[in-house]
Design a protein with these regions (language model features):
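Short amphipathic beta-strand starts and helix->beta connectors
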Residues: 23-26, 65-76, 121-131
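Long, charge-patterned amphipathic alpha-helical coiled-coil/hairpin "stalk" segments used as oligomerization
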Residues: 78, 82, 87-155, 159
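Protruding loop/beta-arch "assembly-hinge" segments enriched in small, turn-prone residues
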Residues: 178-191
Length: 191
């Protein structure tokens, strides 16, 4: 009887996990913006961070101590109502190409911006670790905060206002325009 209950509980957890993952995938669809040939922004919010923490706890089974560590790591990536927060990833499968590209993109995290109504809002990298090493090679993952003033938020919420995301880096001068679907999803981060 005990084993049967345990199996039922495990099945229930697996079913709930599947449902949550399905929700997260659907929600992330309009929180993703590609930039150039190698990078993507994944805009974070409470729901994406909660799902990430739950997934880490499920996989690693670290208990309360791990929960504290995960909360400490991921809470800063939840937007505070006056910012957008993104994980900026360089996704390059070929290791030789990846090393070459990342070696040419030192400090890209400091040259990344969102442009709203002609005003550039430069990213503020998360303070956890330096993302560019002494040789000038950048990390493939960056955690970025875009801190908005009230007038930027107002303009961002105007669906007729063009919003761009890009970098001023000399080796990666790319710009993408946010679709209205993406803007609609991200507007909720200002509430």
């Amino acid at each position: 009887l005990h084993d049967k209950r345990r199996r039922q509980r495990q099945m229930c957890i697996r079913d709930r996990r599947k449902a949550i993952r399905k929700e997260v995938v659907a929600m992330k669809k309009n929180r993703r913006v590609e930039l150039g040939p190698h990078s993507t922004f994944y805009f974070e919010n409470f729901f994406t961070m909660k799902a990430q923490i739950q997934e880490m706890l499920y996989i690693e089974k670290g208990g309360d101590e791990q929960l504290r560590d995960e909360l400490e790591a991921y809470n800063p990536l939840i937007p505070n109502g006056s910012e957008l927060v993104a994980t900026f990833m360089f996704e390059i499968d070929n290791p030789i190409t990846r090393k070459k590209v990342l070696s040419s993109l030192g400090n890209v995290e400091n040259k990344t911006y969102i442009k709203v109504n002609g005003n550039k809002i430069f990213a503020v990298p998360e303070n956890d670790v330096d993302r560019t090493d002494n040789s000038g090679k950048t990390s493939s993952v960056h955690f970025l905060h875009f801190k908005f003033e009230d007038h930027h938020v107002k303009d961002f919420k105007d669906m007729d206002c063009t919003v761009e995301i890009g970098t001023d880096h000399e080796h990666y001068p790319h710009i993408s325009v946010l679709t209205n679907e993406v803007k609609t999803a991200l507007i909720k981060d200002f509430d």
